[in-house]
Amino acid sequence: MSRPIVLHICLAFCSLLLLNFAAQCLAFPNLERREIVLLHAEKGQSERLNTDDLENDSVTSNTPVSGDPMIVLAGPSTMSLNKVFPSNKETSPVGAGLMQADGSNIYTATEPEVPAGEEVFGSSQPERMSPESRPSKATLTNPVMPTASLNIDEREEPSRGTIIQPTVEGTTEATQGFLSYVDDQLFATESPEGLSLGHSPLSLVNTKEMLTTSPRTEKFEANPEHKTTSFPGSKLTAGTEPSQMTADNTQATAATKHWLPTSESILSVEPETDSLLGAPEVTTSVSTAVAAAPVISDEWDDTKLESVSQIKTPKLGDNTETQVRMEISQTTQAPDIGMEVMEEGKALTEAADVSLKLPEMETHMETTLPMAHGGERASDQSSVTPTSPMGDTKVSVMNLVQDTADFVESTKENGAMFLETTVSISEYESEVHQPLGNRFKDIITQEMTTAVQAAEATVSLVTQEQQVATLEVTRGEDETKGGRELPSATVDAPRATQLSRRWEPLATVVSTTPIPVSFKVTPAVEDVMDTVTGPNEELFTPILGSPVTPPGITEEAPSTSPALADPEASSERRTAAPSFSYVNTAASYGLDQLESEEGEDDEDEEDEEEEDEEEEDEEEDEEDKDADSLDEALGDTELPGFTLPGITSQEPGLEQENVVSLEGVTFQVPDAIQWEQQNQGLVRSWMEKLKDKAGYMSGMLVPVGVGIAGALFILGALYSIKVMNRRRRNGFKRHKRKQREFNSMQDRVMLLADSSEDEF
């Protein structure tokens, strides 16, 4: 028995390695491009990153993948990817070593990542430089080992192994701002969706969302509210801390949550980030736990995520600027995105380094994630490393490896490459991000959502409304970022404009390497459809607009390594929103307002007709709550064309900003056309259902009647035959009896005659 088992294990491992290498190969070209930009933009930082890499290498934590060391992710450019740490499961205290190395660069963020063993890599560095605080540490650790819980120095609680989340540390305040913005937008923080979403294993960490954006602080304040929502799924304290969302606490919380990676090598990224962190700017480290949606610290007050990174960076001033509301509801990953976006251009952070490490962590996460989530896939491992949103925002989008660690190596490689290539966002915003300035709105068509069937796909971007809003923002910006274009990115000009206005410095570029998952971007940005991928296909929808990236929209792309190398805004969102009831409705109707609405209605009519009505009220209530929170958080944003209607299925893309601007109004009524289409779809589905039911009944009446009649006839015939036989039998018996009696009389007569003769 042992021999076949060993053979199967070996085969599975080899296949995973091959998949990872393939994914890495796909990601390489983009990474190199990014690296070039980074080299020009951040030579000084690159040196720092290199030193960090060296430190990280020395202290490398084990990669979650099997024993053989992961491929070195070091990019040719500024950051050598921290070499992939050996895959040993044991988590060496490398974290501490890394931390210290980083600490020399900047206050070390004690980023205890308790990899596989729950051992926290304690960094001897000052606690206050908690991983999140390090700007450079935009690390997205996604080790998924359920066993290990990683505790960031200030973590309220060690992240639970089950909730292995990619931890993303936005290095700069801008990143954090973005994170909060995303949080608000993607998750109306209060909306339960965000919570459930965070929980879903499938959710991808949208590194894109993490893209460090150095947007204005407009969204900053809104973030805390959104942050307040705790994710039910997240085991991490993310849920509790997010509510506080004080800059330090929220940030720290995010970090704590995010450092779920149980796997050994989560931490490796951090050291590099620290060195990058030359600038005091704080990186928010938001790692999203699949189960637990990490909290994205919305409030970047002058203390960046203190809890997470406990870093009080002098540059916090910008933090408000950048804080983006991230909608956590969509994905636990939202926090990650927020983090990356955080940097507004403050200081170059070691985002690149973080990114490098991130990939490794990510891979780790990947493997463990399934365990953590139980049935759920580890896809939520996608780690975003918003690298220093400022100086060197290097964002690597790690997309989760959907199954196990397939993606682990490739993801790591991608992350590392991206980090190297990405240029600091704040400093080089114009260089890198202007091209990227256009926000991509990856609207995954509802058709995508229809594919949601699989447990992984189960993460429907529940936070459709909020997602939509975020995606819409990206739309305004150019549809194509400098070299990349999202396969399914559609730009909504008006919303994009708003977003760009908000996040001008942050041009988030999300590029996804071609992913098996095909997600369709609907032209109407407003309907950011929840993208739900098919059971296995992971939808990786990086969204360039930092505010725009709704975690819900992107799902994991199992084999795609996100090419989001945009230093600034690449963020990978993983969305898992199995808990959301209206995920299905959203998926079925999608947020494609006009184009995909009817088609989607037709597709999902049968399944979700009845659900839509039931869920409408619930969703409306949730939306109202979301809108209120958004109003509070995003006072400056202007109303979108329309906010999502009460019905999730028909939710138009609703930017969080837009929602906020609706201050008195929960949501704007959708256009008459949209209502009409929606109603038509509902009526059509109802009619079809009635016809189907009636036809079934009418068709069954005849055969059933004939069958019953035939059965009765047969029973009657049998009974009649039985009765006839009984009569015949009785008559025969009677006849025999008479005969017998006759015979007996004859006998008696004979006997009498004989006796009489004798007597004579």
UniProtKB/Swiss-Prot annotation:
Positions with biased composition (Basic and acidic residues): 216-228, 474-484
The entry's keywords: Glycoprotein, Membrane, Phosphoprotein, Signal, Transmembrane, Transmembrane helix
Cellular component aspect of the GO annotation: membrane
Location of this chain's protein in the cell: Membrane
Modified positions (Phosphoserine) in chain numbering: 755-756
Cited InterPro entries: ARMH4
Bias type Polar residues, positions: 380-390
Annotated signal peptide: 1-27
Domain of life per record: Eukaryota
Topology term for the membrane: Single-pass type I membrane protein
Residue ranges, Cytoplasmic side: 722-760
Membrane spanning stretches: 701-721
Residue ranges, Extracellular side: 28-700
Annotated glycosylation sites: 56
A molecular function (GO) term: TORC2 complex binding
Feature: compositional bias, Acidic residues: 594-635
Assembly description: Interacts with IL6ST; this interaction prevents IL6ST protein homodimerization and bridges ARMH4 with IL6R and STAT3 and therefore inhibits phosphorylation of STAT3 at 'Tyr-705'. Interacts (via cytoplasmic tail) with RICTOR; this interaction bridges ARMH4 to the mTORC2 complex and inhibits the mTORC2 kinase activity.
Name of the protein: Armadillo-like helical domain-containing protein 4
Provenance organism: Bos taurus (Bovine)
